[in-house]
């Protein structure tokens, strides 16, 4: 028995007095209802400055801050809030949940402050939802944040159990929790007990019910659990009844195996009070049936995200380890466990402590071969409860029949003397086997444990009852005699099979060996024999070196031998027990000689046995149901099979030498005669009960007798009277090119009519009233009569149709294919339930309103100029790059009529649309999506003047087992800074699927495309959007209908945005422009600098570059001392950067920078400290002492070469250093400089500086190109104002990071020349190696340059005074 465990940690709620006894009281009560009983609500926000209150917060597991939204977030409030964050830093495991309660105009200010402090868990009251919904959101957040450690994935299941209980009528309610071993039944039951027990007068949780009831007895156990603390022992149920009469009682019986004991236990509880609840957990559904429990909850496995979380916790692996191979290993483990929490946690613990990836992989492979005892014990306890026959069936399925058709398995097992109809149901009830899509499946763990049971019976391979491992089987069957001097010689004695073997399945894909003739001699009880090749590309090589097989076991039920190499089966083989013979691609000429007893034979498949000439023996198999002789090219006749009354299917396709069929059994359902030599069937073969004839006959007389004929294909001449067709339901006249007309078929019962390829057919009088599928592709029909109401598919691909009747009333029509109908002019309407529509290549000028149910639309290449103004397509399965472009183009054709001075009213009339598609169906499409959930772009001036809106593409990763995506949507947030420097945003929510429609099961990844012209920045004067510098940021979040963020269940993996603008007088694909993210290849550092820094002060720029260069998730307290001596205000500077979303500060006080912003900052530094492109022309031209090589050198641009003393004041130009290289044979490095006015004036002047080899006091300066601006005579005020700041920053950077960043590990003692002109802390060192490789490739290195990849980023020359190369030039662009 396990009572609700007392949580050592508690939830601390801080609030103001006004909501303490209203909203907060409801919140605390809701937490208690969820089993979180330790809730402290006595901490008033006004008391947060006192140490006693702070101590309470520090001890809490979760701290909930209920903030008054109607109060201004003043300094007092922020000081109090900071105290909570300080308490949280003292308790690293504590989570902080913020609640902004109450309607307020100050909400944006609060949200800004909370976001600045890095708090992501923010709940706020909204007008559209009640307080109860807000409370439910908070409770779920708190529960999943902290209190479900060890109960991962339980919360959603708790809600389902609670709903199941609430739906039952008042009285004694019962719920069964059912699932496979290790799936989490006990954990779920404990969670339910913890959550609900406080609402009952008495409660008990009896663990391991069968064992407990056996050890303590029923009444003693009940007394102990329901009435704890009583001295007297209750020996009779009457006494217990007196004490608990009419009370509400919660009873949980865990892991019940003996249904009879549980049934007798529950029968004595009819006296419990109304509202009592009895919960039973069991892995056997039969327990619930005997106990009369109808409400059964099947526990499902963990989804992918939950499984990964549990595995990482169990194995103590951090999410951010980042090693791809380690991630792949975790995926394999999770996939193998298939959502079973016990297996995931056990495997995680077994892999814990392995330091090397190779050790973890080896350990996992061993665990798969020999599952841990804890897992085996859990599953074997279910196996031990089975009867002998049930155990045999389970082991047969585990070893041989995984994924096989259930009817096929039942047929074989019946032939073995079992009763599989009943016994397979028992296995299903005990969660050992599942039936899905008419196939038999076992969990991977269950299958491996079943096989482990077989292998654990004995170490001797030849004595194991079932064999499936190829190398073990090869060991038993391989021929072990070799010839020496022409005589057989036994080289060693090999173990052979024994009578214990009952099944042998050999996969020959990777085997080559000779089979001994007596291989099966001792396997007297072998029931199942299958020799096959699972790899169709491999030709198996297994031969009989002696050319004979001595015997086969007479107990065989299944004989499946692909590529059988002999001409016949052993003559002494008795096939009386055979149920199936399956020997495709064999060398058989005949099965055997003489007559054999085949009374049990149901199926024979000898397809593609090209040497087969005789099958007369099959006439003795009176119970035969299927004969498959496809591709038996030498077979000349098919015997009269009139006596085979059970024969249902005959396949003679490809038997080209068969000219006639003498007699067809009366119950035949399928007759395949394609590729035979049969030209006609006698009248006697067409019986009234024939259901299907599949053939290529030229004539079938006597159709009047085929009253039940359902299928007839390739009939070259239609009968003059359709009345003779009786109950024909499928008529295929495909490619009957001479067919010119058909009679009226309105009175027929046809379901399928295929006239495709009937190129001479130009008219049709009427359609059958129950027609479901109509194919008119390639016909000459121009008009069709009224279509039947029952029609589901209409395919007129490539036909000559000019018009169609109104189809709006065809409510069953799902597929409409009009592609290639070049003469089609109009369509009057579409059915409301249409799912697939194809009209690519048509001449339609206008398309009616498309239905919301549409899933597939292909209009590529059509001439349609007008699509509906507003439409939404769901679950597209045909989504390509061209289709996306077509939608963006065709749906926006309207905007070409908008004049340049367009108004908002006209904009509001522009189309909006959305559609979606599974990502796996579009693997070849390139949408230029960027990784992550956000994308940033800069709109150029021409785009801003003609901007209409944006198209958005979002890829969302769904859990593999997630089925109900009805309420899933995407929230898109568009942010920009206006020309006054204020941060602006627009948020739009898009539904992924149409409301009220049935949503199909989503795949792992889904791509959604949205367009809404209102999703655009506001328009200022002259229709120019009010965007400062054109910078726009888009962020995407998965949400539900209550706009609750679903990041914990779904993930936005990639996204992209396209700019939609209007061009006067023309609309083309040029008006749909791809938005580029801040990719270093696509966007230069200077462009990003100008875009992102226009609204920042210089000091804030310095602070941002400092953080982007050296700090990743560092604490504010760590960063602040490093810039202590600088005129930078950390608190205000961080707030400014957070306001413009360049950084955020987490609840732990860590400075967090998104990878996009960090990359942007590095691009700025990269662009200002190292010029990658301009150095190409300057390097190679001036290496005069380098031997000539066959390289393409650029034309020299050398202006002059001068030598000056190292102490010279310089040339009065302002230069910026971008690189330095060691020169082979020289003691001194060479420095490379460019004009500091490159970007502001477009100056391309560069120079190279190197100390002279003969006189180190002299500098050799090579000038390349001329300046295009006058020599600067006065420094900018900005340079003077920032110099001191920059120097201090450099000092701080050098102190804090030189030891971890700037040291060359290959040359630790190599000195760097100091410089005052370039800061020692140049952040260019943080750039990726690929950037340095690109720099080196552009340098066109010759033989005199020391290798390489050595970029001395910080050394400088002493000759330049500080005034010449100020740090401020790094920023003054």
Curated annotation (Swiss-Prot):
The organism's taxonomic lineage, starting at the top: Eukaryota, Viridiplantae, Streptophyta, Embryophyta, Tracheophyta
Name any one Pfam family assigned in the record.
Answer: LRR_3
Residue ranges occupied by any NB-ARC domain in the UniProt entry: 170-421
- By which gene is this protein encoded? RRS1
| LRR repeat locations | 498-522, 535-553, 554-575, 577-598, 621-646, 665-688, 742-766, 768-793, 831-854
Q: Which GO terms describe its molecular function?
A: ADP binding; ATP binding; DNA-binding transcription factor activity; sequence-specific DNA binding
Motif stretch (Nuclear localization signal): 988-1005
Region called Disordered, residue ranges: 1300-1323
**Which residues participate in ATP binding?**
179-186
Do you know which InterPro entries this protein is assigned to? Apaf_helical, Disease_R_plants, Leu-rich_rpt_3, LRR_dom_sf, NB-ARC, P-loop_NTPase, TIR_dom, Toll_tir_struct_dom_sf
Tell me where it mainly resides: nucleus
> What cellular component terms from Gene Ontology apply here?
nucleus
Assembly, in brief, is: Interacts with PopP2, a R.solanacearum type III effector.
Is this entry keyworded Transcription regulation? yes
Q: Does Transcription regulation appear among the keywords?
A: yes
Q: Which residues form the TIR domain?
A: 5-146
PANTHER family in alphabetical order: DISEASE RESISTANCE PROTEIN, LEUCINE-RICH REPEAT-CONTAINING PROTEIN
Look up the further comments and give them: Ecotypes susceptible to C.higginsianum or R.solanacearum, such as cv. Columbia, contain a protein with a premature stop codon while the longer allele found in cv. Nd-1, cv. Wassilewskija or cv. RLD confers resistance.
Query: What's the name of the protein?
Result: Disease resistance protein RRS1
Q: Where is it localised?
A: Nucleus
Q: Which UniProt keywords apply?
A: ATP-binding, DNA-binding, Leucine-rich repeat, Nucleotide-binding, Nucleus, Plant defense, Repeat, Transcription, Transcription regulation
* Organism of provenance: Arabidopsis thaliana
Q: Name one GO biological process term.
A: signal transduction
DNA-binding region, as residue ranges, is located at 1204-1272
- Main function: Transcription factor. Interacts specifically with the W box (5'-(T)TGAC[CT]-3'), a frequently occurring elicitor-responsive cis-acting element. Also acts as a disease resistance protein involved in resistance to fungal and bacterial pathogens, including R.solanacearum, P.syringae pv. tomato and C.higginsianum.
């Amino acid at each position: 028995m396990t009572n609700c465990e007392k949580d050592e940690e508690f939830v601390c709620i801080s609030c103001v007095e006004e909501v303490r006894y209203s909203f907060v009281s409801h919140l605390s009560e809701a937490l208690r209802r969820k089993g979180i009983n330790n809730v402290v609500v006595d901490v008033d926000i006004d008391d947060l400055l006192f140490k006693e209150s702070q101590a309470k917060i520090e001890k809490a597991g979760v701290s909930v801050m209920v903030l008054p939204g109607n109060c201004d977030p003043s300094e007092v409030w922020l000081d109090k809030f900071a105290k909570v964050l300080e308490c949280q830093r003292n308790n690293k495991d504590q989570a902080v949940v913020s609640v902004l309660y109450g309607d307020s105009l100050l909400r944006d200010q609060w949200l800004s402050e909370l976001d600045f402090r890095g708090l992501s868990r923010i709940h706020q009251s909204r007008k559209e939802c009640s307080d109860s919904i807000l409370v439910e959101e908070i409770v779920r957040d708190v529960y999943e944040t902290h209190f479900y450690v060890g109960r991962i994935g339980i919360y959603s299941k708790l809600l389902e159990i609670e709903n199941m209980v609430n739906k039952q009528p008042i009285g004694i309610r019962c719920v069964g929790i059912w699932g496979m071993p290790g799936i989490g039944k006990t954990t779920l039951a404990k969670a339910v007990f913890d959550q609900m027990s406080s609402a009952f007068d008495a409660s008990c949780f009896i663990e391991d019910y069968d064992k407990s009831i056996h050890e303590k007895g029923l009444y003693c156990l009940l007394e102990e659990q329901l009435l704890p603390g009583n001295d007297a022992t209750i020996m009779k149920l009457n006494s217990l009844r007196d004490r608990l009469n009419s009370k509400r009682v919660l009873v949980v019986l865990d892991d019940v195996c003996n249904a009879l004991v549980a049934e007798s236990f529950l029968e004595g509880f009819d006296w419990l009070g109304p509202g009592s609840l009895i919960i039973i957990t069991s892995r056997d559904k039969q327990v619930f049936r005997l106990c009369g429990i109808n409400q059964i909850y099947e526990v499902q496995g963990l989804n992918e995200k939950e499984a990964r979380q549990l595995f990482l916790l169990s194995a103590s692996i951090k999410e951010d380890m980042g090693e791809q191979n380690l991630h792949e290993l975790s995926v394999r483990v999770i996939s193998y466990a298939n959502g079973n929490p016990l297996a995931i946690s056990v495997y995680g613990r077994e892999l814990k402590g392995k330091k090397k990836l190779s050790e973890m992989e080896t350990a996992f492979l061993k665990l798969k071969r020999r599952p841990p005892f804890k897992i085996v014990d859990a599953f074997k306890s279910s196996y031990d409860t089975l009867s002998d026959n049930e155990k045999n069936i389970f082991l047969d399925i585990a070893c041989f029949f995984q994924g096989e058709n259930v009817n096929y398995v039942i047929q074989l097992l019946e032939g073995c003397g079992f009763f599989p109809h009943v016994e397979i149901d028992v296995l299903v009830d005990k969660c050992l086997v599942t039936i899905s899509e008419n196939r038999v499946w076992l969990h991977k763990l269950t299958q491996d444990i079943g096989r482990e049971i077989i292998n654990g019976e004995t170490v001797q391979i030849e004595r194991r009852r079932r064999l499936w491992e190829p190398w073990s089987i090869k060991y038993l069957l391989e021929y072990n005699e070799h010839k020496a001097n022409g005589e057989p010689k036994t080289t060693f004695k090999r173990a052979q099979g024994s009578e214990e073997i009952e099944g042998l399945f050999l996969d020959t894909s990777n085997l080559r060996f000779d089979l001994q003739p007596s291989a099966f001699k001792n396997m007297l009880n072998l029931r199942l024999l299958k020799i096959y090749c699972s790899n169709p590309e491999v030709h198996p090589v297994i031969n009989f070196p002696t050319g004979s097989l001595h015997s086969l076991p007479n107990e065989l039920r299944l004989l499946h031998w692909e590529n059988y190499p002999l001409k016949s089966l052993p003559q002494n083989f008795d096939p009386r027990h055979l149920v199936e013979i399956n020997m495709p691609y064999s060398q058989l000429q005949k099965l055997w000689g003489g007559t054999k007893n085949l009374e049990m034979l149901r199926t024979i498949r000898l397809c593609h046995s090209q040497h087969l000439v005789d099958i007369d023996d099959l006439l003795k198999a009176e119970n035969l149901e299927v004969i498959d002789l496809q591709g038996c090219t030498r077979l000349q006749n098919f015997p009269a099979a009139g006596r085979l009354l059970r024969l249902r299917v005959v396949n003679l396709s490809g038997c080209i030498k068969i000219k006639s069929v003498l007699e067809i059994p009366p119950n035949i359902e399928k007759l395949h005669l394609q590729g035979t030599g049969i030209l006609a069937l006698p009248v006697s073969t067409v019986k009234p009960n024939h259901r299907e004839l599949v053939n290529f006959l030229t004539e079938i007389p006597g159709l009047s007798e085929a009253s039940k004929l359902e299928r007839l294909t390739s009939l070259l001449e239609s009968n003059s009277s359709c009345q003779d067709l009786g109950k024909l339901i499928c008529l295929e006249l495909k490619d009957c090119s001479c067919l010119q007309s058909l009679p009226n078929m309105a009175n027929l019962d046809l379901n399928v009519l295929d006239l495709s390829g009937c190129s001479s057919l130009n008219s049709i009088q009427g359609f059958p009233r129950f027609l479901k599928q109509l194919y008119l592709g390639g016909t000459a029909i121009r008009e069709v009569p009224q279509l039947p109401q029952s029609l589901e598919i209409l395919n007129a691909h490539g036909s000559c149709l000019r018009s169609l009747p109104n189809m709006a009333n065809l409510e069953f029509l799902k597929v409409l294919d009009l592609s290639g109908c070049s003469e089609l002019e109009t369509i009057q309407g579409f059915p409301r339930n249409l799912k697939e529509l194809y009209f690519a290549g048509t001449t339609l000028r206008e398309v009616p309103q498309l239905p919301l149910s549409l899933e597939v639309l292909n209009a590529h290449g059509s001439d349609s100029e007008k699509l509906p103004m507003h439409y939404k397509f769901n679950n597209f399965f045909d989504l390509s790059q061209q289709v996306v472009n077509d939608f963006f183009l065709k749906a926006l054709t309207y905007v070409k009529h908008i004049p340049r001075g367009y108004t908002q009213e006209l904009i509001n009339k522009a189309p909006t649309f959305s559609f979606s598609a599974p990502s796996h169906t579009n693997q070849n499409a390139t949408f230029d999506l960027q990784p992550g959930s956000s994308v940033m772009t800069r709109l150029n001036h021409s785009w801003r003047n003609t901007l209409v809106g944006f198209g958005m593409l979002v890829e969302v990763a769904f859990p593999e087992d997630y089925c109900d995506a009805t309420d899933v949507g995407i929230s898109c947030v568009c942010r920009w800074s206006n020309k006054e420097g204020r941060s602006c945003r627009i948020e739009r929510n898009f539904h992924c699927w149409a409301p009220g429609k049935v949503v199909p099961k989503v795949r792992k990844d889904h791509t959604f495309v949205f367009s809404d012209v209102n999703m655009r920045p506001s328009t200022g004067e002259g229709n120019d959007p009010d965007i400062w510098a054109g910078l726009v940021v888009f962020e995407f979040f998965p949400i539900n209908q209550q706009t609750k963020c679903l990041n914990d269940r779904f993930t936005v993996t990639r996204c992209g945005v396209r700019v939609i603008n209007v061009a006067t007088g023309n609309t083309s694909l040029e008006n749909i422009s791809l938005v580029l993210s801040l990719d270093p290849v696509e966007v230069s550092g200077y462009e990003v600098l100008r875009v992102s820094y226009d609204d920042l002060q210089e000091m804030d720029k310095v602070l941002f570059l400092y953080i982007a260069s050296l700090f990743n998730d560092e604490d504010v307290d760590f960063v602040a001392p490093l810039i202590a001596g600088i005129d930078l205000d950390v608190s205000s500077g961080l707030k400014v950067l957070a306001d413009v979303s360049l950084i955020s500060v987490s609840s732990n006080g860590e400075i967090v920078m998104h990878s996009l912003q960090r990359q942007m900052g590095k691009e700025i530094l990269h662009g200002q400290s190292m010029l990658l492109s301009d150095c190409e022309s300057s390097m190679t031209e001036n290496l005069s002492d380098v031997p000539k090589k066959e390289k393409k050198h650029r034309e020299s641009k050398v202006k002059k070469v001068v030598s000056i003393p190292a102490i010279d004041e310089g040339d009065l130009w302002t230069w910026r250093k971008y690189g330095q290289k060691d020169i082979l044979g020289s003691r001194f490095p060479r420095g490379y400089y460019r004009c500091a006015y490159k970007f502001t004036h477009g100056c391309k002047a560069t120079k190279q500086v190197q100390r002279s080899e003969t006189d180190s006091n002299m500098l050799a300066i090579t000038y390349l190109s001329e300046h295009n601006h006058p020599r600067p005579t006065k420094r900018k005020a900005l340079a003077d104002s920032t110099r001191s700041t920059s120097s201090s920053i450099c000092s701080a950077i050098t102190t804090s990071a030189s030891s971890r960043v700037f040291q060359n590990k290959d040359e630790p003692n190599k000195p760097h020349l100091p410089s005052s002109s370039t800061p020692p802390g140049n952040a260019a060192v943080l750039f990726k190696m690929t950037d340095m490789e690109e720099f080196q490739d552009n340098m066109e290195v010759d033989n005199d340059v020391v290798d390489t990849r050595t970029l001395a980023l910080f050394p400088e020359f002493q000759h330049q005074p500080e005034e010449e190369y100020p740090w401020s030039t790094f920023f003054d662009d």
